[in-house]
From Swiss-Prot:
The lineage of its organism: Bacteria, Pseudomonadati, Spirochaetota, Spirochaetia, Spirochaetales. The record marks 10 as: Discriminates between blocked and unblocked aminoacyl-tRNA. GO terms for cellular component: cytoplasm. It comes from Borreliella burgdorferi (strain ATCC 35210 / DSM 4680 / CIP 102532 / B31) (Borrelia burgdorferi). The active site is at 20 (proton acceptor). Monomer. TRNA binds at residues 15, 64, 66, 112. Signal peptide: none annotated. This is Peptidyl-tRNA hydrolase. GO terms for biological process: protein quality control for misfolded or incompletely synthesized proteins; rescue of stalled ribosome. InterPro entries: Pept_tRNA_hydro, Pept_tRNA_hydro_CS, Pept_tRNA_hydro_sf.
């Protein structure tokens, strides 16, 4: 089995290290931790790991998050993958900072990146990893997800990214349920 990990975020330095870009940040951690580098295609950057369980393709879209679906279906054919190989990594304001939720499939809720992907694929039958970015009821949601983390929050997230970078690269169909339990019970 192969795995295509799609980290959601917005391109550009102004969005770097914002709450909305935790998908990008996690993929950057996996890339650096494994001594890889990102290559550039027309609509995305990618890197590839070869694991015992199969290839792991890491993808960062060069489109804005709300247009993430525009990568499909061509990205599947570029890497000989299909929807069952897809794992989308994204932010979630309903989870506390440092908490994760790995799901085999689910709805699109209010996340525009998921909505875009599901609309193009005609299905929401793919895995996703939600990374909690906390919430601030005093600010509007758009301003909040586009805000940067403070130093204490970044320190916690770095520990989480380190943990997740080890856990995600060897996910397979055989161990998915165990990974769900381990990742979902973690808290950083």
């Amino acid at each position: 089995m192969g795995l295509l990990i799609l980290g959601l975020g917005n391109p550009g330095l102004e969005f770097s290290l914002t709450r909305h870009n935790v998908g990008f940040s996690l993929l950057d951690k996996i890339v650096s931790k494994n001594g890889l580098f990102l290559k550039r295609k027309k609509k995305y950057e990618y890197s590839e790991l070869k694991m015992i369980s199969g290839r792991v393709i890491l993808v960062k879209p060069l489109t804005y998050m709300n247009l993430s679906g525009s990568l499909f279906p061509s990205i599947f054919s570029d890497f000989y993958m299909c929807i069952k190989n897809l794992l989308v990594v994204l932010d979630n304001v309903d989870l506390p900072l440092g908490k994760c939720r790995l799901k085999e499939r689910g709805g699109v809720s209010t996340h525009n990146g998921l909505r875009s992907i599901s609309s193009v694929l005609g299905s929401s039958n793919y895995s996703r990893l939600y990374i909690g970015v906390g919430s601030n009821l005093m600010r509007d949601i758009k301003s909040f997800v586009l805000s940067r983390f403070c130093k204490d929050e970044m320190d916690r997230l770095e520990k989480l990214y380190d943990f997740l970078s080890d856990e995600l690269i060897d996910i397979s169909e055989a161990n998915f349920k165990n990974k769900v339990q381990k990742i979902n019970s973690s808290n950083f």
